[in-house]
């Protein structure tokens, strides 16, 4: 229904992707911003070949090396990016969500360096609270749901 009403819109997956939902994700989304493990990359590669449809892909980098967050740690990023290219994944860029109590621009800068040395132009970084800094650092995609729709109600 969304596609029928908004046929010119691009739909991006910005949340975690479970391996068992890969088929639906490739069918539904124009971009996937959370490639965070080799098993997922391998399944996406097979599904893209099967469907003949290739959403843009962003690899999630855990620049803060936070245990509670998904993503590839910076020291393993170059190898993971290479692995994804060898799977013929259409990697557009990298994505980061900085640690909440740290200066986001440091993490945006690190993401930009990793992207640059791997020939990637897409930078998915910045949320409602820090998107200005992300844009200043070269973000190509930002997530501003709270700024548009208001804060979430967790009650």
Task: Name each region found by the language model.
Residues 2-6, 132-155:
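C-terminal helical cap(s) of enzyme catalytic domains, especially alpha/beta-barrels
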